[in-house]
């Protein structure tokens, strides 16, 4: 189908174009008249935000150019550090360049201040030219790879290394905020991307190889550890170590058996079966030339490093009678028994009715002694039972020393009984598994001698008990009443002792001066 346009339609079209031209001329005439009536020049429209965009239709005047470049802090801008830009793939070390004007705009995202644009391009309405100029007014002279600054495209250290003084590349407003905040401060903020020749940050970049020069215990501790903790973890004391304690002389120590074992019931093979030796052996430590008023002698008795060990030996010679051998109740004066020959040791044990070969063979199969064989000292300020207390030996009568209870009673008969301090070793948990005739050997040792001398622990003193009988269950006569010494030691704080006697059941306590003590305890 063919459409025919008549002459009327063509005339109307031409009339509309003429009307549009007349309206445009009227608008321009009104604008010109308004400008002439106001008397002030009408400034061309510009769109300026921190120097990012300007009107490219006309060149601004010199006054407008100075107004745009004026900021609130000119003193700091005079020394403003250069902006940091990533290097391009073709040039890893951009050079410092400055120019007053640019013919074209840079790529969007890297705006700069003090920029004057050319008339040939409009950043808002016109397309960018094919060739662009320099990317920025300032560019930093970056250090080379010899200064530990490697640039490899997108994996640059600019993104990896944080810095409190570096602002965002695409935001001039953030940089202006930092400039106004630290304008009056002289503190330099280190940044690993600045060159060593920067006038604002002189010699503040981390020195290469500094961590390798430090000692091993000081590396990577200054930033992650509070101050003062390095001395606690890596303490290097310059003060001399305290002098070692003086080694005690072993010639002063003596052991005395205050309470001899008399009988025991054989216990079973299990560890829970306890049949303690009756009465419990009580050993007292004596000192030669002991002075109760001497602090040194009292401190020796209070030494917690003392210990007494107990050994069990079967008696194979039934003809041996208690008291027939020397040293049945007193300590052996020869403290260097470890230096004796084997022949002398065998002869001395034979005099006591003990066969070492039989005792060693028996101990290899099943241990005969069970319980607590090593005990610690128990110190008291006053002697609990002065009637049976031995006298401390002196250096004059050391060869004929006899501290039996009968001799002690005779010594203190005609004068008031003193109550000196005393040190006891109480064996309240000793059991024997097999019936027979046995003797106990007690040895005094001090754990501190290893610390003082660094040598093996010597035996300071030793003492042998009298032979006692271990009976089977059907032959055992029963437990005896507790002695006065046992009762008073329990009253003084040694709670492991078990007391027996008339009126001494569970829940009852017998005082030291009570009249309920058995007659046997009074006689002793």
UniProtKB/Swiss-Prot annotation:
Residues 131-153, 178-195, 393-402 have a biased composition (Polar residues). It comes from Emericella nidulans (strain FGSC A4 / ATCC 38163 / CBS 112.46 / NRRL 194 / M139). One of its GO terms (cellular component) is nucleus. InterPro entries: Velvet, Velvet_dom, Velvet_dom_sf. Interacts with vosA. It comes from the Eukaryota. The gene is velC. Disruption phenotype: Leads to increased number of conidia and reduced production of cleistothecia. Increases expression of brlA, abaA, wetA and vosA genes that control sequential activation of asexual sporulation. Induction: Specifically accumulates during the early phase of sexual development. It is found in: Nucleus. Gene3D superfamilies: Velvet domain. Residues 248-500 form the Velvet domain. GO terms for biological process: regulation of asexual sporulation resulting in formation of a cellular spore; regulation of sexual sporulation resulting in formation of a cellular spore; sporulation resulting in formation of a cellular spore; trehalose biosynthetic process. Velvet-domain-containing protein that acts as a positive regulator of sexual development. Positively regulates the production of the sexual fruiting bodies called cleistothecia. This is Sexual development regulator velC. Residues 114-195, 322-349, 380-413, 503-524 are annotated as: Disordered. Pfam families: Velvet. Its main location: nucleus. Belongs to the velvet family. VelC subfamily. Keywords: Nucleus, Sporulation, Transcription, Transcription regulation. Disulfide bonds: none annotated.
